[in-house]
Swiss-Prot record:
Stretch forming the signal peptide: none
Name this polypeptide is given: Large ribosomal subunit protein uL18
Function description: This is one of the proteins that bind and probably mediate the attachment of the 5S RNA into the large ribosomal subunit, where it forms part of the central protuberance.
Gene expressing this chain: rplR
Any GO CC annotation of this UniProt entry: cytosolic large ribosomal subunit
SUPFAM superfamilies, per database record: Translational machinery components
Length: 121
C-alpha cells in the first residue's frame, strides 16, 4: 500500500519539476500525455490562455476498433490521431510533456506516433 502511494507521489513530484521548465505557447503548445492502466490520453495545451486546443485518447470514437487500449500499439495510434487533429488546426510544433513518467514504452510510443504523422518536437 505504501509503495504504491510513494510511487504515485514520486511521479507527481517529477511532473512538477518537468512542468517548471515546460511552457506551452500559442506558437508551440504543450503535448501532455497521461497514462492509466487501461487507457492513454493526450492533449495539446496553450498554457498562456489555459486552453486545451486538441485532445485524443483510446476512448476516442476514431479508435473504437482497437483490440486492446492499454498497450503500445494503442498508444502509437493515439499519437498519430493527436498529430492529425493538431495539423488540421494548424499546429505543427509542440513541446512534449511526458507527465512525470519515464520516456519509455507507451509514453515513447505516443511521441513516435505523433512524429511519424508529421508533428515536430
Amino acid at each position: 500500500m505504501f509503495i504504491k502511494k510513494d510511487r504515485k507521489l514520486a511521479r507527481q513530484r517529477k511532473h512538477l519539476r518537468v512542468r517548471r521548465r515546460l511552457m506551452g505557447t500559442p506558437e508551440r503548445p504543450r503535448l501532455s500525455v497521461y497514462r492509466s492502466l487501461r487507457h492513454i490520453y493526450a492533449q495539446v495545451i496553450d498554457d498562456t490562455r489555459g486552453v486545451t486546443l486538441v485532445a485524443a485518447s483510446t476512448l476516442d470514437p476514431a479508435l473504437k476498433g482497437l483490440e486492446s487500449t492499454g498497450n503500445i500499439t494503442a498508444a502509437r495510434k493515439v499519437g498519430e490521431l493527436i498529430a492529425r487533429k493538431a495539423l488540421a488546426k494548424g499546429i505543427n510544433k509542440v513541446v512534449f510533456d511526458r507527465g512525470g513518467n519515464i520516456y519509455h514504452g507507451r509514453i515513447a510510443a505516443v511521441a513516435e506516433g505523433a512524429r511519424e504523422a508529421g508533428l515536430n518536437f
